[in-house]
Amino acid sequence: MKTFLNKIILIIIFIFPSSIWGKDVLLQSTTSTKNSGFYSYILPIFKNETGINVKVVAVGTGQAIRNAENCDADILIVHAKSDEEAFVENGHGIKRHNLMYNDFVILGPSEDPAEISNSQSAEEALNSIFKFGYSFISRGDNSGTHKKEKNLWENAQIEISDYSGKWYKETGSGMGTTLNITAELNAYTLSDRATWITFKNKKDLKILYEGDKNLFNQYGAILVNPERCPYTNLKESKIFLNWLLSKNGQETIQKYKVNGIQLFYPNAN
């Protein structure tokens, strides 16, 4: 009888997600937030206050959204607003909330051979890279950063796919790998500021262009819709979301710094 019951328990564990057995929350999020140390900072604070453990899967925004659409998530934190809104409109998420922001920066070799540092806009900077034909390294992974980069090329009226494999090279990888390749090739790239600040292998790279309003980088948070994903851990993930949006959570986000530099700025709604 005991053996039979053990088999039944194993079958149930196999069929149903682990989140319904405990307090773990499965968070699909970006490499930029995890690699910056953000979650290593805030999640222990949240767990200490609530007893709830949050497990993070860090991938590009596009992949994170696909994973959540496949019910492999309880909550989503990414940075591609139009895709986030579509996620909710298509019934996969309950509601999108602004959570925090920072910005993107254009990096390149310190001597700046494409002369982008005096540009008046991000699009002008990209046009200079295009004009000189200097190497630009793209993530090429459908991440939030990649989506922003493609949007900037479009605004600059450059059909970037025409130059793929020439001076425009795609890594198909995360920001860390892309930065390493950019540093090795002494090329240009677009990065979120948080990853750049925490990146160790800077070599001769530096920020050459920043501050354009089009480089704004908004992060959103969305609970997965239990009507689409009935086994989602809605109870604990809602506690986590409410904490992130609360005064306490927002102050915790604001306090996270690396080498005295604030990486994310809370702006919950």
Feature roles, as predicted:
Residues 1-9:
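Bacterial N-terminal signal peptides that target proteins for export
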Residues 106:
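Serine endopeptidase catalytic core focused on the charge-relay Asp
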Residues 71, 102-103:
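Short, conserved active-site loops that position catalytic residues or coordinate cofactors/metal ions
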